[in-house]
From Swiss-Prot:
Main localization (coarse): plastid
GO annotation (BP), single: translation
MF-aspect GO terms: structural constituent of ribosome
Lineage: Eukaryota, Viridiplantae, Streptophyta, Embryophyta, Tracheophyta
Localization per Swiss-Prot or TrEMBL: Plastid, Chloroplast
Top-level taxon: Eukaryota
InterPro entries, sorted: Ribosomal_uS2, Ribosomal_uS2_bac/mit/plastid, Ribosomal_uS2_CS, Ribosomal_uS2_flav_dom_sf
Family: Belongs to the universal ribosomal protein uS2 family.
Protein name: Small ribosomal subunit protein uS2c
Keywords: Chloroplast, Plastid, Ribonucleoprotein, Ribosomal protein
Cellular component per GO, a single term: mitochondrial small ribosomal subunit
Gene: rps2
């Protein structure tokens, strides 16, 4: 895998608050190599390490995108949800930003059935099929469609398991991470000072609470995916 330059600036990361970890009482000792200091009761993340692993992650997604691989971005907590959907749409990736339904990947056949149901209901709505039904039946189907859209809207075009999964906040998305590990799907995970850095294939130490920090990490990854996709189109 070729190493590239991704313009990851330490000062820009500091302005985004990427270096602020959790309180010193709330930490995972395995994160010690990624922590540079303690300040006012919180751990400070070593941004040189962040830059290194973010660069590695950008190289990985560029390489995968240049070969036409598919990505899934997962981030369901309120602070991350909008950022995840915008980033995924920009990079033409699949995403989950509301709730991870257990077995979404490990029980893919069930997820596929739900997606087929979702597509059928969307078609029915677009062709005004609901209008031809009794009001009560139409209301039930509309509720079903609304629920499916909430939880599966970001993966509605996914036809198989993703090649790489990007996880925003490892603690929050632990179930998704375990499913990826079970299936052998490569993962890139944003980890704060309370996380285990040994679980994901590439762990990026960073503040997972600040919107600016999450945005910074996502923007770099999405840019790399976009560059890789452009390379794929040019070479195909």
């Amino acid at each position: 895998m070729t190493k590239r330059y991704w313009n990851i600036d330490l000062e820009e990361m500091m302005r985004a608050g990427v270096h602020f970890g959790h309180g010193t009482r709330k930490w995972n000792p395995r994160m010690a190599p990624y922590i540079s200091a303690k300040r006012k009761g919180i751990h400070i993340i070593n941004l040189t390490r962040t830059a290194r692993f973010l660069s590695e992650a950008c190289d990985l997604v560029f390489d995968a995108a240049s070969r036409g691989k598919q990505f899934l971005i997962v981030g369901t907590k309120n602070k991350a949800a909008d950022l995840v959907s915008r980033a995924a749409i920009r990079a033409r990736c699949h995403y989950v930003n509301k709730k991870w339904l257990g077995g979404m990947l490990t029980n893919w056949s069930t997820t596929e059935k739900r997606l087929h149901k979702f597509r059928d209901l969307r078609t029915e709505q677009k062709t005004e099929g609901f209008n031809r039904l009794p009001k009560r039946d139409a209301a039930v189907l509309k509720r079903q469609l609304s629920r499916l859209k909430t939880y599966l809207g970001g993966i509605k075009y996914m036809t198989g398991l993703p090649d790489i999964v990007i996880i925003i906040d490892q603690q929050e998305e632990y179930t998704a991470l375990r499913e990826c590990i079970t299936l052998g799907i490569p993962t890139i995970s944003l980890i704060d000072t309370n996380c285990n850095p040994d679980l994901a294939d590439i762990s990026i130490p960073a503040n997972d609470d600040a919107i600016a920090s999450i945005r910074f990490i996502l923007n770099k990854l999405v840019f790399a995916i976009g560059e890789g996709r452009s390379s794929y189109i040019q070479n195909s």
